[in-house]
Regions:
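Extended alpha-helical interface modules used as scaffolds for assembling large macromolecular complexes
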Residues: 16-226, 230, 243, 257-273
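Short, conserved secondary-structure transition motifs
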Residues: 250-257
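Arginine/glycine-rich "motif VI" loop of SF2 helicases in the C-terminal RecA-like domain
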Residues: 234-241
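Conserved beta-strand scaffold positions in the cores of enzyme catalytic domains, especially
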Residues: 246-248
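Single conserved hydrophobic/aromatic residue that forms the stacking wall/gate
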Residues: 1-7, 11
């Protein structure tokens, strides 16, 4: 837009046509500095692969921004790289908790573009298969859901701690990446008598059911469902009315030599609110 004396505002014809035609997309400007940072990410400097995977899954990463020396080309630590990404607008900074996260889906797409090539196949496979996993969950296909989560978990062992609850939550957020289109995803959402591990709240005007996920270690997927009901985690959906899918996922840490042994199991139930 540009001011014009006595004529009000003057707009570019191309912009007006895009607005009238509802033609919108992400046109994120890439800078030379970001291209340089991308090399560090792709080379896994300072264990950036695991950290970027966590960011893409929706995690918040703690950093120390005070060490940054305003040097746009020399990086001594992951703190320097993430602090510069904050300055460039690719990450947002939480002053209270001193953490960084990806601010929106537009920037999230840029991080995915950054990792699409060069040894990130397990992460990309999880993202590509995430829509199929989401609909399998909605359709109640328990065995398929358990199988897909097991695959994502095993293929990302090298960049995530396997036997760690936060890691499992990260894996699930990555495995359900496509859900962000229709849902707002919350981890450890307060509701009832505790905190639900992951809650999928439908966005406005989306015709999809809400989803509540509970994770268990060395117990059972039935126990996970029982905990959702006992602690009334559905109360975290206080403004929601409709169908809710309860998903219990258990990780079995015991060893077995059986050929058909699976570490992950899944139970899915449906209720109405």
């Amino acid at each position: 837009v540009a001011p014009s004396r006595g004529l009000g505002d003057v707009y570019k014809r191309q912009v007006v046509m895009s607005l009238l035609g509802h033609d919108f997309d992400s046109y994120w400007t890439k800078t030379e500095t970001y291209e340089a940072l991308k090399k560090y990410i792709q080379m896994d400097m300072y264990h950036l692969k695991a950290l970027v995977t966590q960011l893409i899954s929706g995690s918040h990463i703690k950093i120390n921004p005070d060490k940054f020396q305003n040097d746009m080309s020399t990086f001594a630590s992951v703190d320097d790289i993430f602090t510069l990404l904050v300055h460039l607008g690719y990450l947002t900074y939480d002053f209270e908790n001193q953490t960084v996260s990806i601010p929106n889906q537009e920037v999230q797409k840029e991080f995915i573009n950054c990792i699409e090539d060069g040894g990130w196949e397990p992460v990309m496979d999880a993202i590509r298969n995430s829509e199929a996993l989401l609909w399998a969950t909605i359709d109640g296909k328990e065995e398929y859901v358990a199988q897909m989560i097991e695959q994502v978990h095993q293929e990302n062992i090298s960049i995530l701690k396997y036997n760690d609850e936060n890691s499992m939550s990260c894996v699930l957020s990555l495995a359900y990446y496509a859900a962000r289109k229709d849902y707002v995803m919350y981890r450890e959402l307060a509701g009832g008598k505790g905190f639900a591990d992951i809650v999928f709240v439908p966005r406005k005007y989306r015709d999809v059911p809400a989803i509540v996920v509970e994770l268990k270690w060395d117990k059972s997927s039935d126990a996970a469902i029982a905990q959702i009901k006992k602690k009334e985690y559905m109360q975290s959906l206080k403004d929601y009315h409709g169908e809710v899918i309860l998903v219990g996922i258990n990780y079995d840490n015991t060893d077995s030599v059986k050929d058909d042994y699976k570490r992950h199991s899944c139970r899915i139930e449906r209720i109405k609110l």
